[in-house]
């Protein structure tokens, strides 16, 4: 069976029986139509307990790629941290205690929602209450979501935060995630969020009034303009700061702005000393204490391929590059032996519905080049279904699917010509459901199944399964015995 193999991840394209508001169903997709007729396919679970998340929790790109690469179910940070907090272990957490003991004032910042992709509001509340038990003054810096949850749900989450506020816990600032959680080096966005932390951009309104004023201007949660509230005078030297997001990719830039001595992305008010801690490891170069260090993941797909002295190439555009490198390799930043990485720049647009094809063509050209070079394993992510789906724009999401389909057609044709095997699946769904039951735009991921197609010598049928079955399936196509730590293949 041994073949050179393609692992294609069509981000955000999921399975849904209903056709209403289903961008995948309504797209013209001759390549998918061909695969449905000629290739064995099945359905793959991407959410909840199947990927180490709480029951019913929607999957996401980080969790999905980690599970794909590991070939087994991993307890994700959300579950691990929640269990720790439920067991009252925070009072014995050395990184947490050391950080809050260094100052009377503790700043907590993070995404205020229960989306569970980057953070969870229960973690936010638990840390604030634990700080209060230690007689600290707690400043809450709220980042509104509107992307992993409904676009106008911030007031609901705000009430939960206000329920714990008192003379010791106060809401200091607010910012839409578009500004405070950029990951594409758009530091003009980070600067606005940073300035609010410094006590600039004051509003006389209360937090709830300010959110409503943004809604009145047709600004939804994701894009709420950073502001700080009365009685907040800004962060001061020698105070403590904890960023409560457990996912790292959208936390790095704001933490860099706060803590890095050498920082030139914008002119800032710098600190002599700020006692920073992060929920999980955000970057290997960061010297900050970590409340929940990563658990080591051994024998990932990329590592096993490297151990067999085979070549591999990981390809994606900017928005998903971390997912096909750091996350799919089990949280390992450094490439393995014989691992090549190709980064295609994502288009510089405000939102991707303005360019639904994104950089899929550039990604495809890189894949075709690696195939012609004879690379043994090619892992590629197409970001369109997810990134355009997040905008809530149905017509643009249809175009996104059509762009991916055209690219898949080129890849599938060359795969057959060069005798490449192929496994195509998604890390989670998104664009197959673009409106909720009330006909409001749905911008978050779906908690459902995705397709899995296989092109391989002798493969006539494949079983239903989950993302933890992908790595062993890829290794089987390559003629490599999967390690005992991996779950069974799909065929």
UniProtKB/Swiss-Prot annotation:
Top EC category: isomerase
Pathway(s) served: Carbohydrate degradation; glycolysis; pyruvate from D-glyceraldehyde 3-phosphate: step 3/5
UniProt protein name: 2,3-bisphosphoglycerate-independent phosphoglycerate mutase
GO biological process terms, semicolon-separated: glucose catabolic process; glycolytic process
Binding site for Mn(2+) 1: 386, 390, 445
NCBIfam families: pgm_bpd_ind
InterPro entries: Alkaline_phosphatase_core_sf, BPG-indep_PGM_N, Metalloenzyme, PGAM_B_sf, Pgm_bpd_ind
EC number, UniProt record: 5.4.2.12
A single Gene Ontology CC term: cytosol
Recorded family membership: Belongs to the BPG-independent phosphoglycerate mutase family.
Record keywords, A-Z: Glycolysis, Isomerase, Manganese, Metal-binding
Keyword rRNA processing: no
Molecular-function annotations in GO: manganese ion binding; phosphoglycerate mutase activity
The gene coding this protein: gpmI
Catalytic activity: (2R)-2-phosphoglycerate = (2R)-3-phosphoglycerate
Self-association and partners: Monomer.
Keyword ATP-binding: no
One Pfam assignment: Metalloenzyme
Residues reported to bind Mn(2+) 2: 11, 61, 427-428
Cofactor(s), names only, from the UniProt record: Mn(2+)
Cofactor binding note of this UniProt entry: Binds 2 manganese ions per subunit.
């Amino acid at each position: 069976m041994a073949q050179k193999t393609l692992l294609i991840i069509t981000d955000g394209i999921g399975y849904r029986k209903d056709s209403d508001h289903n961008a995948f169903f309504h797209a013209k997709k001759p390549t998918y139509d061909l695969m449905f007729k000629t290739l064995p396919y099945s359905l793959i679970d991407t959410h909840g307990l199947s990927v180490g998340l709480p029951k019913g929790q929607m999957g996401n790109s980080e969790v999905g790629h980690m599970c794909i690469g590991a070939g087994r179910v991993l307890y994700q940070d959300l579950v691990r941290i929640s269990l720790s907090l439920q067991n009252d272990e925070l009072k014995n957490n050395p990184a947490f205690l050391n950080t809050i003991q260094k100052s009377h004032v503790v700043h907590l910042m993070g995404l205020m929602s229960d989306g569970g992709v980057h953070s969870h509001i229960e973690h936010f509340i638990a840390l604030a209450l634990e700080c209060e038990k230690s007689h600290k003054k707690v400043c809450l810096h709220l980042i509104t979501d509107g992307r992993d949850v409904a676009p106008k749900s911030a007031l609901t989450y705000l009430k939960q935060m206000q329920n714990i506020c008192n003379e010791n816990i106060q809401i200091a600032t607010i910012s839409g995630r578009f500004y405070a959680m950029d990951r594409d080096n758009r530091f003009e966005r980070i600067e606005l969020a940073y300035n609010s932390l410094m006590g600039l951009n004051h509003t006389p309104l209360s937090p709830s009034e300010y959110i409503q004023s943004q809604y009145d201007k047709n600004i939804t949660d994701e894009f709420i303009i950073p502001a700080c509230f009365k009685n907040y005078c800004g962060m001061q030297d020698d105070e403590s700061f904890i960023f409560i997001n457990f996912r790292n990719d959208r936390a790095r830039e704001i933490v860099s702005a706060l803590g890095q001595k050498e920082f030139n992305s914008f002119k800032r008010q710098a600190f002599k000393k700020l006692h920073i801690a992060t929920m999980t490891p955000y970057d290997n170069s960061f010297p900050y204490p970590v409340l929940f260090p990563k658990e080591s993941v051994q024998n990932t797909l990329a590592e096993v391929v490297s151990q067999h002295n085979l070549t591999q190439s990981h390809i994606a555009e900017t928005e998903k590059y971390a997912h096909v490198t750091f996350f799919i390799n089990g949280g390992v930043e450094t490439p393995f032996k014989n691992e090549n990485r190709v980064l295609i720049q994502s288009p510089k647009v405000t939102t991707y519905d303005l360019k639904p094809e994104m950089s899929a063509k550039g990604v495809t050209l890189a894949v075709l080049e690696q195939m012609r070079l004879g690379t043994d394993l090619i892992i590629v992510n197409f970001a369109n279904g997810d990134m355009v789906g997040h905008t809530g724009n149905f017509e643009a999401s249809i175009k996104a699917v059509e762009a991916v389909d055209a690219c898949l057609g080129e890849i599938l044709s060359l795969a057959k010509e060069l005798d490449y095997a192929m496994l195509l699946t998604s890390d989670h769904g998104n664009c197959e459901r673009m409106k909720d039951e009330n006909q409001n735009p749905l911008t978050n991921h779906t908690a459902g199944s995705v397709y899995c197609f296989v092109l391989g010598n002798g493969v006539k049928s494949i079983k239903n399964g989950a993302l933890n079955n992908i790595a062993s399936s890829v290794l089987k196509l390559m003629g490599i015995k999967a390690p005992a730590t991996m779950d069974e293949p799909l065929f």
